[in-house]
Amino acid sequence: MKKFLLFVLFLCPIVSMAQEQTKIDSTMIVRISEIEVYPEYLKEYLEFAHNVGATSVKEEPGVICIYPMQQLRNDCQIRILEIYASLEAYQHHIKTEHFQTYKQGTFHIVKSLDLVDMRQMAPECLPLIFNYCCPLKV
């Protein structure tokens, strides 16, 4: 029982810090785009996805991450992890020339699209993940 109480007391500051970090990051938009592309346009789509992701992160301060990925079991299944500093950053992003080029250029390529908004479960880990390779832009 004594060990359990010590464990609970140890966790209290960690939970408190996590709750405080959640308040800070509550304005962030985190989304996974689930995309299926037509096989005959796969190569073309991959170029569009790479370009819009790289340009967005490089040129838009409110874009924290646009990370396109392909399923190993089905090349035509694409997932894009999108993280924006705020709703305003997302709204700015979708109005940019590079996003509009992507959207218009892939209209005939995308078979299905589902934008899945996500809730962060460990927002305090986000800086650690992104600082592993590069500083977090918020």
Located regions from the model:
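N-terminal targeting signals for Sec/Tat export/insertion, comprising classic cleavable signal peptides
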Residues: 27-58
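Bacterial Sec-dependent N-terminal signal peptides
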Residues: 1-22
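Hydrophobic alpha-helical segments, especially transmembrane helices
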Residues: 3-4, 32, 94, 104
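Short, glycine- and small/hydrophobic-rich beta-strand elements in well-ordered beta-sheets
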Residues: 20, 54-79
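An amphipathic, aromatic/His-enriched active-site/gating alpha helix that lines ligand/cofactor pockets
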Residues: 24, 55-65, 83-118
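Glycine-rich beta-strand-turn "strand-cap" elements at beta-sheet edges
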Residues: 19-30, 67-74, 103-138
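Short hydrophobic/aromatic beta-strand micro-patches
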Residues: 36, 81-83
